[in-house]
């Protein structure tokens, strides 16, 4: 699901809200979440999951074309850990219907 599809789905289920208001709310929420992670803070949404940063230490990699060693700097990467309710819901729905390939 893309951001546009999410906005459409919410707007169709909430006809009393203007489409533009739904779009603004989704964009602001995602922007705030990005800023929070960029500031090194954790986000926890009970029943859904938590977003945090994981540290990846510096390492030596290889250029796939030349095979030359390349120094890769340390970095932080976003990480999502699903909550118990989300895991259970996903697992129960997977047993009922096969996954659709896109």
UniProtKB/Swiss-Prot annotation:
GO molecular function: DNA binding; structural constituent of chromatin
Bias kind Basic and acidic residues: ranges: 82-91
Region (Disordered), start-end ranges: 54-102
PROSITE patterns the record matches: HISTONE_LIKE
Keyword Signal recorded: no
InterPro entries for the chain: Hist_DNA-bd, Histone-like_DNA-bd_CS, IHF-like_DNA-bd_dom_sf, IHF_beta
SUPFAM superfamilies, A to Z: IHF-like DNA-binding proteins
Keywords annotated in UniProt: DNA recombination, DNA-binding, Transcription, Transcription regulation, Translation regulation
An individual GO BP term: regulation of DNA-templated transcription
GO CC list: chromosome; cytosol
Assembly description: Heterodimer of an alpha and a beta chain.
PANTHER family named among the record's database cross-references: DNA-BINDING PROTEIN HU, INTEGRATION HOST FACTOR SUBUNIT BETA
Known role: This protein is one of the two subunits of integration host factor, a specific DNA-binding protein that functions in genetic recombination as well as in transcriptional and translational control.
UniProt record similarity statement: Belongs to the bacterial histone-like protein family.
NCBIfam families: hip, PRK00199.1
Protein name as catalogued: Integration host factor subunit beta
């Amino acid at each position: 699901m893309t951001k546009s599809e999410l906005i459409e789905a919410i707007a169709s289920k909430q006809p009393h809200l203007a489409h533009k208001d739904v779009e603004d709310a989704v964009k602001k929420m995602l922007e705030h979440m990005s800023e929070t992670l960029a500031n090194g803070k954790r986000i926890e949404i009970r029943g859904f999951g938590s977003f945090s940063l994981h540290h990846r230490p510096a390492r030596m990699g290889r250029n796939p074309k030349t095979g030359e060693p390349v120094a890769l700097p340390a970095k932080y990467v976003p990480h999502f850990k699903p909550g118990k309710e989300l895991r259970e819901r996903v697992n129960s729905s997977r047993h009922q219907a096969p996954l659709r390939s896109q």
